[in-house]
Amino acid sequence: MRILDTTLFYTQASGGVRTYIDGKRQALLRRGDTSHKVVMPGSRVFFDGDFVSLPAMPLPLAPGFRFPLRLGLWSSIIAGLQPDVIEAGDPYTPAWAAQRAARLLDVPSVGFYHSDLFTLVHHRVGRFLDPGTRAYIKRLYEGFDMVLSPSRVMAEQLHRCGIGEVEVQPLGVDLEAFQPQRAKPNARRALGLSEDQHLLVFAGRGTQEKNIPVLLEAMRRLGPDYH
């Protein structure tokens, strides 16, 4: 089986979506009967083994990210790679290109709602765009054969936009990296924490949509037993 992922979130600067795709890729290639390709934004058309970069415009307010504009080019190259399944990991041009290529090839397409577009637009632009954003999300994700969400919260957001069937697919935890055997007692002592105190760690990008002020307020309310 030939599986293809496409998203503008697969860049050197990206985080969770790239981690998800890389983890999935490793699992697929271990099967031995599956090939996997990634189509991502770049400065020009460039083929590097299983990775294909296609032209996209740099985003001044999001360093490291590029936004594709050439829907026709993206869809034709994706179709030319002849995948059996296409998964789109964003709600932008790559998603529309994935759907168009899937129709050309008569293969299934999957939309993974990694990025909460509705909340992003609501907070950064204004609630006056809420109806239009919901209509856009509904129109886009109705075009996929399957819609995935990484959490129940995101799935409920899609339901509010009019998407009926959404499969919740948690991204999971890397158990090789995160396990009790890797605990370092010296780390707690270096922070001046007792054995009874709870240590909470946030690992992620410090961007607005991560709602870090909410996390900090939660920590304040939890009190001195939490660090």
PLM regions: where:
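Donor nucleotide-sugar binding/catalytic pocket of nucleotide-sugar-dependent glycosyltransferases
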Residues: 134-183
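Conserved donor-binding/catalytic core segment of Leloir-type glycosyltransferases
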Residues: 4, 194-220
